[in-house]
Amino acid sequence: MPTWLKVTIILIALFFALLVATIYMGYRAAMRLGEDAKTTGDEATAFAQGKESPACVDEAVARAVKCNKGDAFCLMRAQMFMMECLDHAKMPPDFCASVPAHNGFQIRNRWAADECARRGHPDDARCNQMLQTLQLHCSSKR
């Protein structure tokens, strides 16, 4: 068998091995994310019982700032927690009044940055992300 054919067969085998490994890892990540979503949703629903919406925001921000920078799964869990908690907590009538709509890029970013600084997390992208999630929630309630 010629050398070029051996090299080609080895490269094809390596390609398929990498393909199988990628599919397997993607499947495992999807299963983990599904389990995390259910667990986080259950935690948020339990947390929301007897509480008002601001408590949900405080807890979600606290969870987010504990995430390692760059840990997208942790931030997604914090966002899921906030959305689920806000859906089950009692919302005060004026809760969203001071939250700007999620349509003006500069306005929403400035508000989130100012609010994070007020909460003791200046220049923290994780806090900003949580408050932008709050803006989405409030925009959908208007």
What are these regions (language model features)?
Residues P2, R28-A30, M83, L131:
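Generic N-terminal initiation segments characterized by hydrophobic and/or small/turn-forming residues
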Residues I23-A72:
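Immediate post-signal-peptide N-terminus of mature secreted/exported proteins
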Residues K6-R28:
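Hydrophobic membrane-insertion alpha-helices, especially the h-region
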Residues M1-I9, L33-E35:
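N-terminal positive-inside, membrane-proximal cytosolic segments immediately preceding the first
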Residues P54-D58, A62-R142:
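Non-cytosolic head/periplasmic domains of membrane-anchored proteins
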Residues V7, F16-L19, T39, E59, ...:
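Alpha-helical protein-protein interaction elements
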